[in-house]
């Protein structure tokens, strides 16, 4: 009976070792779970960005407001009867910001 108990104990020790330290053990399991959680967070951010881009595409295809906004902001276009004003910072402020950028 002692040899059987010793054999079963040796098998139990081997199984525990492989569970904790072996390939596909607890450490690998926790690492993979962390990787999956990080990937799911990344996927959620990308899905939100895709949804935003699809909404912008739909707005550009169907609505004139987004097209008008882009024309105003990027091309500085105005409607008939409107006056365009460009605000230019003071020369002293420009010199200060240029001096800070050179550092």
UniProtKB/Swiss-Prot annotation:
Keywords: Cell cycle, Cell division, Cell inner membrane, Cell membrane, Coiled coil, Membrane, Transmembrane, Transmembrane helix. It is a single-pass type II membrane protein. One of its GO terms (cellular component) is cell septum. The keyword Cell division applies. It is found in: Cell inner membrane. Residues 31-71 form a coiled coil. Essential cell division protein. May link together the upstream cell division proteins, which are predominantly cytoplasmic, with the downstream cell division proteins, which are predominantly periplasmic. This is Cell division protein FtsB. It comes from Shigella boydii serotype 18 (strain CDC 3083-94 / BS512).
